[in-house]
């Protein structure tokens, strides 16, 4: 914990110099000694980041351990009350929300993507506007998406609308969240497959990787929340052509 490089890194991140801080952190963790830190040092460094609520460094540092594994560091649950309450209020599995946020932003509240998505749940401006209208958030302004609770409300509401549109398939809804809903609607039109096999056949590399990571994260979070082992296979379910006659929501962005 007394490592000056790590302290400098956390200070830089705290005052808004995120990329410099991350560079300093990564250097301190991995490059200043041959082979990098050992497991005990990595867990101590991750703990330092967790305590400072720098969740991306907490997760990424803890994931570097080779033998000792700290699941709470690898799968933290920040903003616990806000996420659980919102997910439960709209009938969404909180583990799924956490699994998605971990992949989208690593819990960095002011994360911005190169395509303009914002916040914890990386919501696009047009999607935010559409979702706000859909859920009756009449006072919504574009800049509000950077507010933590608004971001969680909009992101979870959109995810639930996508999940309902895909008849509860977490794999397809995750693909839709990443690539837009039109693509997974087409990708499901082959034979009925186990979700894991379907995910392996998603033609976009980024979306394929995303779906697998979100569902794997979700399974780990569900195990932590329930205190019971979980099945990734059960969570992925099966994916195949639409069996109900209900129409897709044509304006789902």
Residue ranges: model-predicted function:
Residues 1, 5-8, 15-253:
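Catalytic glycan-binding domains that act on GlcNAc-containing polysaccharides
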């Amino acid at each position: 914990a007394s490592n000056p490089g790590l302290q400098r890194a956390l200070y830089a991140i705290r005052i808004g110099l995120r990329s410099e801080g991350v560079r300093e952190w990564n250097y301190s963790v991995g490059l200043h000694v041959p082979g990098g830190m050992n497991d005990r040092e990595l867990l101590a460094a991750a703990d330092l980041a967790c305590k400072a609520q720098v969740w991306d460094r907490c997760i990424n540092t803890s994931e570097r351990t080779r033998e000792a594994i700290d699941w709470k560091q690898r799968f933290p649950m920040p903003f616990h009350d806000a996420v659980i309450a919102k997910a439960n209020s709209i009938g969404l599995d909180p583990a799924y929300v956490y699994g998605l946020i971990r992949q989208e932003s690593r819990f960095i509240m002011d994360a911005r993507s190169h395509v303009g998505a914002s916040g914890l749940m990386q919501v696009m401006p047009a999607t935010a506007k559409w979702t706000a209208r859909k859920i009756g958030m009449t006072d919504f302004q574009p800049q509000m998406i950077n507010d933590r609770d608004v971001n969680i409300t909009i992101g979870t509401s959109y995810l639930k609308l996508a999940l309902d549109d895909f008849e509860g398939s977490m794999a397809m809804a995750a693909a839709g969240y990443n690539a837009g809903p039109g693509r997974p609607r087409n990708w499901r039109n082959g034979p009925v497959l186990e979700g894991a096999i379907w995910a392996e056949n998603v033609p976009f590399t980024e979306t394929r990787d995303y779906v697998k990571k979100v569902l794997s994260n979700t399974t780990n979070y569900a195990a932590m929340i329930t205190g019971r082992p979980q099945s990734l296979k059960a969570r992925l379910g099966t994916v195949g052509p639409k069996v109900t006659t209900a129409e897709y929501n044509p304006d789902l962005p």
